[in-house]
């Protein structure tokens, strides 16, 4: 980034030394970020799920160790970016798994039609996959003087097996009934 406006190295810190540090997020001013227990509000009472303390997303911003999956593989691996990753438990499978383990509140921003719900300020009502929404995110970050540089970065997304369209992760409450027993009653 030195070419894009300059910087000076003031020191070097190993990632392990950062674990536990608290920080302010770029969109902590949004109502959804300040909702105790997550957004939309959870359907369980405090204490019914591990780590549920009814804290807002803003109150839980901290640097964590990304951990490992069930096979012992690092969840965040070298070669996939900076090595510092924001966990968004309502926006991705791995994020949701790690967030649940750590008791982080879940912010599930998308409605059924793929637009941001109420509580997301200028993003409310906008389609998540619309390039204009990404541009608005960049504009908001610039206003807050939090944007250093923008570049296109390849990112692996799930795709529909039939159409090839990119899919967005949307957290929903669902339940299923196991119907395997029906053959036994005939």
List where the protein language model places each region.
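Structural alpha-beta junctions
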Residues: 2-7, 58-59, 103-105, 143-145
């Amino acid at each position: 980034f030195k070419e894009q406006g300059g910087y000076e190295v003031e020191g070097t810190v190993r990632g392990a030394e950062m674990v536990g540090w608290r920080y302010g997020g770029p969109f902590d001013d949004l109502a959804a970020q300040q909702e105790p227990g997550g957004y939309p509000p959870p359907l369980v009472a405090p204490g019914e799920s591990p780590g549920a303390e009814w804290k807002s997303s803003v109150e839980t911003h901290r640097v964590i160790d990304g951990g490992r999956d069930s096979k012992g593989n690092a969840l965040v691996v070298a070669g996939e970016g900076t090595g510092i990753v924001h966990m968004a438990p309502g926006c991705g499978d791995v994020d949701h798994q790690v967030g649940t383990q750590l008791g982080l509140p879940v912010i599930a921003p998308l409605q059924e039609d793929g637009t941001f719900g109420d509580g997301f300020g200028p993003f409310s009502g906008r389609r998540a996959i619309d390039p204009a929404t990404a541009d608005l995110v960049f504009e908001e970050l610039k206003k807050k003087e939090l944007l250093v540089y923008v570049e296109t970065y390849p990112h692996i997304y799930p795709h529909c097996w039939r159409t090839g369209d990119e899919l967005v992760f949307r957290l929903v409450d669902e339940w299923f009934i196991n119907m395997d027993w029906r053959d036994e009653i005939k």
